[in-house]
From Swiss-Prot:
Belongs to the TatB family. The gene is tatB. It is a single-pass membrane protein. Keywords: Cell inner membrane, Cell membrane, Membrane, Protein transport, Translocation, Transmembrane, Transmembrane helix, Transport. This is Sec-independent protein translocase protein TatB. It comes from the Bacteria. It comes from Cupriavidus metallidurans (strain ATCC 43123 / DSM 2839 / NBRC 102507 / CH34). Residues 92-132, 146-168 are annotated as: Disordered. It is found in: Cell inner membrane.
C-alpha cells in the first residue's frame, strides 16, 4: 500500500489544519478515520472471501480425487468378484454335471443357510439369548426385566385414595 512515515503524516496534518481550519478539523478527521476503517474492513472481507474460495476449490479437487479413487477401487472389487463368481459357477456347473450323471437322487442341494442353522442348533436369536443362566446375568449386571420410565414411575408412586385423571 502507501508508505506513510511520521514526517509525511505531520505534513498532511499541517496542510489540513491550514486548509480546513481548526474548527472543522476534528470532524473531518473522524469522518476520514471512519472511511479508512470501512475500507480496511472491506479489504479484509474480500481477502477472507478469496481465501475461502481457494479452500473450497482445494476441497473440491480433493473430493474429486477421492471419488475417482473410490470408483477405481469399486470397479476393481466388482471385477474381482465377477471373476471369482464366474470361476465358482464354472466349477459348480462342472461338479453338477458330473454328479448328475453318477447320481440320480432327488437333486437336493443344501444351502449354506440350512447348513449353518443345523450346525448351530438354535434358529432364534432370542432363544440363544435366553439360554444364559440367571446367576450369570446377575453376575454380569444384565437387566432381566426391562421396564419403561412411565411404568417405573407408576410402580414407585405412592398409591392415592382415588384414581385421578388428567382431565378431571
Amino acid at each position: 500500500m502507501i508508505d506513510l512515515g511520521i514526517s509525511k503524516l505531520a505534513l498532511i496534518g499541517a496542510v489540513a489544519l491550514i486548509v480546513i481550519g481548526p474548527e472543522r478539523l476534528p470532524k473531518v478527521a473522524r469522518t476520514v478515520g471512519a472511511l479508512v476503517g470501512r475500507a480496511q474492513r472491506y479489504i479484509n472481507d474480500v481477502k477472507a472471501e478469496v481465501s475461502r474460495e481457494v479452500e473450497l476449490e482445494e476441497l473440491r479437487k480433493m473430493r474429486t480425487e477421492f471419488e475417482n479413487a473410490a470408483r477405481d477401487v469399486e470397479q476393481t472389487i466388482h471385477k474381482e468378484v465377477s471373476e471369482h463368481t464366474q470361476a465358482l459357477n464354472e466349477a459348480f456347473d462342472g461338479s453338477a454335471s458330473s454328479s448328475s450323471s453318477s447320481d440320480t437322487g432327488s437333486g437336493y442341494v443344501p444351502s449354506w443357510d440350512s447348513a449353518h442353522k443345523s450346525h448351530n442348533g438354535r434358529k432364534s436369536w432370542r432363544v440363544k439369548q435366553g439360554a444364559r443362566p440367571i446367576w450369570f446375568k446377575r453376575q454380569q449386571n444384565t437387566r432381566m426385566w426391562v421396564q419403561s420410565g412411565a411404568a417405573r414411575v407408576k410402580r414407585h408412586r405412592p398409591a392415592s385414595g382415588r384414581n385421578r385423571s388428567f382431565f378431571e
